[in-house]
Amino acid sequence: MHIRRCIISDIHGCYDEFNALLRQVNVDLNQDELILLGDYVDRGPKSRQVVEQIMQLREKHGVVVIKGNHDAMMVKALMNDVEEYDRHWIRNGGLQTLGSYVEIHFDEEQIDWSAYTEAKQWIRSRYEHHLRFLSELPLVYEVPGYIFVHAGINPDVEDWRGQPERDFIWIREAFYTRPTSIPGTVVFGHTPVKHLHDHADIWFDPSGDKIGIDGGCAYGAQLNLLEIGEDGSLQKFHVKKGETGEGSAD
């Protein structure tokens, strides 16, 4: 069956840009396949709203939702009381996520740890379904000719499907600087494409085995969408950070 596929990665709480992009490309969730490559939370302002929306999109429309490293980091910090996990999450934009759930502004320079712990407990009790949803997300999605993953695949692992979760959601240079040596094209996020070709548009590896789509929206750049048409053609779309209409695209 030939269908139009629309792929977005690294939304990072950029809820308004995400919905503006869905509207711009006229994504029809009854016909098109929407594939999301992870990192729904952290850094941006509306992580809770993004998580709620993608949960509904998967339930209602079968949208493909893949796990990213920030999603795993959030769950690890919130479901445990381990300072190392908390500090790691906070260094990577976790306070913005926390603020979207509890509407308290946390100062990263001078954290009120008792308020932080209280907020964690509240999220655990009130939003356990969010944490469970994020923790159980798949790491990869395959269709003929394409592998969709958050960070990449490890060329040093004989069968990439057996690589550890860490590679699926964290790998960088070991993946994108080397040939994959497998059939098909790997579509990935995680590494902002400006690190791959000095601008925020979708990166197409010259060898044809990789496509990087993280436009760095949470860093002030843009949110990208890769369209794989019914005929197999590739098109790229984007919304710049802050260039949005309001509301969600159903």
Where are these regions (language model features)?
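Active-site environment of divalent metal-dependent phosphoester hydrolases
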Residues: 12-16, 42-45, 72-75, 190-197, ...
